[in-house]
């Protein structure tokens, strides 16, 4: 089975006193910043405290720290990682001819500071690379009546999971194995990853072939959180029950 897990970016990380003291010493500005205990800031924390002196399993303080946080908090071992920039995301979607998906609401949002202009109509449609980026990033904007609405990060997370499920279902198949060379080029240009070297890449290709030759199921794992305000900052705190 393929399990898709989307970690809410505002998850609260309760760092140890050792990590906090290191951060206070090496990066007092970050230590004093509100929101540094969100999981989406963990890679920055790892870099600032020079976690494991860049000698961890990935040889990169920020990635090693985030991977160890995920393992400690969620008991999920990170064997490899792939960091995809937005250009790479768009290019990969276009390489496979887009993704057919149902857009649940009118998505209209303009943000000149990010050079982000989202404009999607609701309904079933095939999204190209740029439109797919709009779809997975949208969480607030104008509805069909022209009213501004905040749909929350939870709404965006659900859309991201649906997008990944649709991408896997539509494109992870034998007929697309011929795109491996083009995909490898895109990976080299746009993706930072631990999956390097002929042997490791071959292992993943063989794993892909095995999954294509058998029926497999897709599961979306939901991380149950509760909204919380700590020192005036919004967090998602993981439910313990």
PLM regions: where:
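Non-catalytic, solvent-exposed segments at the cell envelope interface
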Residues: 1-241
